[in-house]
Structures are given as structure tokens and as C-alpha cells.
């Protein structure tokens, strides 16, 4: 009888924190103004199998979109804590396919997770893992190059929202 095999290997990830000069509410509003939600027409077209319409929506979309936003602060309230924090999934479906066409496991990290929270000093902070360090683990320069492009795009929009 055969058994499933498991492979484990350590990876090194570069973690980034950006402390804002504005309040949590102002930074959240700025981010959501700069990065729109993912166009629901994309998912709807894919669900219907309408690849032409999905591609039209994808190609007219923004460089980055918010796939989801989770109010982690709401969850913390169940533990009796009051914290302002939102976890975002941010990315671009076309960018994701540039990587997954070469290395399907990159889908583990696309879209990217970004955490926005208010720290103890009352300042808003973004934290995320640098895309090129996540995607670099796959050892495919085509994927790592896309990760480096994402490094610049993500940092640029977060710094703009934070400032």
C-alpha cells in the first residue's frame, strides 16, 4: 500500500511594516479609495464560463484590486478586545495567472494578504510579507520577476495611503 508523501522545507520571507502618519480611519479610507474592489463581473463571467467577458473585465481593471476585506477587529471583540484591524487580500487576477501558469503553487500567495491595524500609540500600521520573497521560494525567475513588480506596486500604494 502506498502512502502520501510530505515534503517540508524552510523558506525565508521578508516582512514589511509601514507606520502611517494618519489615523486608522483615514488610512483605511485612503487605501480603499486607491485600490478598488475586484470587479464582480469577473467572477460572474467565469462562473458562467464566459471567458470573453471575463477577459474584457480583467484587462480593463486596475493594477491592484481588493479581493476581500475581513474585519479582524470584529473577531477580536468576541475575545473581549477592542482593536481596529482589517485583513485585506489585494492583487490582480492577470498578475496571478502570470505566475500560476509557470508555478501553480504560487496561488497559495495570490492574492496577497495585507493587514491594517491601529497600534498601541494610536497610529495606523500596514504589515505584509514582501511578494518577491514569497514567490522567490519557487525558484522560477519568471515568477520572481512578477513578485518584484508586485513589491513596487504594493509598497507604492500602501505608502501613499499611509502618508
Where are these regions (language model features)?
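Charge-rich, low-complexity N-terminal segments
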Residues: 1-58
